[in-house]
Amino acid sequence: MRFILPTILLSLATSFAFAQTEAPAPDNAPLSQCEKFLDGMSLLTPDNDYAVRDIPDGCIVSNSMYQTGSIMGWTVERVIFELDHLQDFLSELPDFGKAAPTWGRIAIDGVRMRLQSGNKVSDYITSIQQWPMDFTAFYRFNPQSGYLHIQNAEINSIKFGKASVSAEINLPVDASIASLAANPTATLSSLRLRLDNQGLWESLVLPVLANYAALPSETGEEDPETDIARLRDIVSKSVEAMPDSQIDTKSRKALLNFIRDMPYPAGFFTLDLHFDNPMPIGLNDMEPSKIAEHALAAAKISVTYRVR
């Protein structure tokens, strides 16, 4: 499950142009503005006791499902998302020439994986082994300067720990919703990652990394365990080769220890990246290899790592 943070947050501000297609409501009852919006986006599907409710500048969705494949999905107890003047953008004649909303918030509660393998025993065992996860994020945006601050986007589980990301991003000055939807490019000035790992890394991040690492490579390997070990060696050598002006001795040691402990980095990890020349980012720049390549080449890096 990929979490491409800038894209997720900006999509709430740029996807309204594609959310105006109406579908017939059951019993000819008119759809609410939030129902029309969600129907047009086609991101969430109804689960048992599904409900949608409009709130000022936002929507609440209860008991939905996000499908990620033919045999796997994620059930969600509740989603709350709010945007500055959201109801204006959900009107019959929205003005997409306006600047993007200056603030937005999303809270996703009770996320659990649901297996749909066709084997009732396997699906049941998987369901009772799930622990709920919650996700929250908040952003502020200044259209005049193009400054976008993603504040503490956090995923949290009472069982697996938590991880949070914050970032400072620069968008085109005075960009409209329409222009951002047509050309979603930006530059990244800083990125902060916090991880309290008690299994969260292995449950969410590692499957994505394994899927990426298992792609056919120059070694000819397609086994994720082998290729993750290969990537671990490559990244370690890259960190060792970084100049002291980019990472100090203490941070270098902490980062190498974190990499060494893969795939089970049990403990507290912090990573701060700062770019003197902001790094260009776009929808085509979100692959792990590209992010790591840019970060290792251009960012000033500060790291702490404490084993639990």
Each predicted region: which residue ranges?
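Positively charged n-region of N-terminal signal peptides that target proteins for export
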Residues: M1-L5
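Bacterial N-terminal signal peptides
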Residues: P6-S15
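Glycine-rich, small/hydroxylated-residue low-complexity segments
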Residues: Q20-R308
